[in-house]
């Protein structure tokens, strides 16, 4: 469990963006950089929490792991999907709580957050606001020059949020170094 590393964990020496796809069971994350008109994937994965833990313990684990990523990579910018209300109110509440602790960790780390609607992320990554999940995953793979689609799905979604932060020009320091 914990952080699943699916890409390089080398120390980042240039400005980067963290993308987060919050969820109580699995919170996806992705760290990318952008320079010389080229994206680079630094690390991605998922923070998993066990269902037998108390709600507060699960939220603390998410907070601690996101804080560790911020400490390790020192991102100045973050992209996160806005919460959309699903039919399942319990699920929406859990995602909202996870999102809250992620936003707290980002605020404590001095990370500037851009929040994007799902269709905005799809459009920024694929050019199509109504793109299917698989199209977004393929676009993330292509944009970041990865050999395969990032797994788990939450990590791919987080990388898409980070790409959106850059593609929409909603970054300060990252673009300043381009």
UniProtKB/Swiss-Prot annotation:
Mg(2+) 2 binds at residue 81. Its cofactor is Mg(2+). It holds the Pfam family RuvC. GO terms for molecular function: crossover junction DNA endonuclease activity; DNA binding; magnesium ion binding. Binds 2 Mg(2+) ion per subunit. GO terms for cellular component: cytoplasm; Holliday junction resolvase complex. Homodimer which binds Holliday junction (HJ) DNA. The HJ becomes 2-fold symmetrical on binding to RuvC with unstacked arms; it has a different conformation from HJ DNA in complex with RuvA. In the full resolvosome a probable DNA-RuvA(4)-RuvB(12)-RuvC(2) complex forms which resolves the HJ. The RuvA-RuvB-RuvC complex processes Holliday junction (HJ) DNA during genetic recombination and DNA repair. Endonuclease that resolves HJ intermediates. Cleaves cruciform DNA by making single-stranded nicks across the HJ at symmetrical positions within the homologous arms, yielding a 5'-phosphate and a 3'-hydroxyl group; requires a central core of homology in the junction. The consensus cleavage sequence is 5'-(A/T)TT(C/G)-3'. Cleavage occurs on the 3'-side of the TT dinucleotide at the point of strand exchange. This is Crossover junction endodeoxyribonuclease RuvC. It comes from Treponema denticola (strain ATCC 35405 / DSM 14222 / CIP 103919 / JCM 8153 / KCTC 15104).
